[in-house]
Every structure is written in C-alpha cells, then in structure tokens.
Amino acid sequence: MTDINRTLQGRVISDKMEKSMVVAIERTVKHPIYGKFIKRTTKLHVHDENNECGIGDVVEIRECRPLSKTKSWTLVRVVEKAIL
C-alpha cells in the first residue's frame, strides 16, 4: 500500500469556527456536449490548529484521517495572505 497524501490549493471563505475553516477549491470542467469550460467549486472543511488563516488567504491543504463528521483535511501552509 502506498502512502500518497493528496494536496490541494484553495481560498479560505470562512474562518468563524475554532481551529477550523472552510476552503473553496476551484476547478474547470469541460461541458460534455457543448465543450464550454465551466468553473466548479468544492468547499472543504479544514483543520487549522493555530488559527493562523483569515478570509481570502490562499492555502495549501492535505488530506488526512477523518477528524470529525465533515473534516478530513488539514492545513499545510499559507501560500499567500489576503490584503485587507
């Protein structure tokens, strides 16, 4: 069995929870019939141990074991801080 940790990059859209945040992951998908590229967004709940992220920050996250009912991702690093 290989230990492959999935990492993604996204933008923080909510940080109101204690030690948690919601990250939006944007991807483009080609429409199966018309061929137009469409933006699709996935919202993931992420564990933030030190509460270091704010709304608008670009972060890198990694998949981990389930930490709660909705959280199975953890923060790796803050790529870019948001300009307030």
Swiss-Prot record:
Keyword terms: Ribonucleoprotein, Ribosomal protein, RNA-binding, rRNA-binding
GO biological process per UniProt: translation
GO molecular function, one term: structural constituent of ribosome
InterPro entries hit by this protein: NA-bd_OB-fold (IPR012340), Ribosomal_uS17 (IPR000266), Ribosomal_uS17_bact/chlr (IPR019984), Ribosomal_uS17_CS (IPR019979)
GO (cellular component) term, any one: cytosolic small ribosomal subunit
Residues annotated as transmembrane: none
Domain of life: Bacteria
Matches recorded under PROSITE patterns: RIBOSOMAL_S17
Pfam family, one: Ribosomal_S17
SUPFAM superfamilies recorded: Nucleic acid-binding proteins (SSF50249)
Complex and partners: Part of the 30S ribosomal subunit.
Record-stated family: Belongs to the universal ribosomal protein uS17 family.
Protein role: One of the primary rRNA binding proteins, it binds specifically to the 5'-end of 16S ribosomal RNA.
Record-given protein name: Small ribosomal subunit protein uS17
Encoding gene, per UniProt annotation: rpsQ
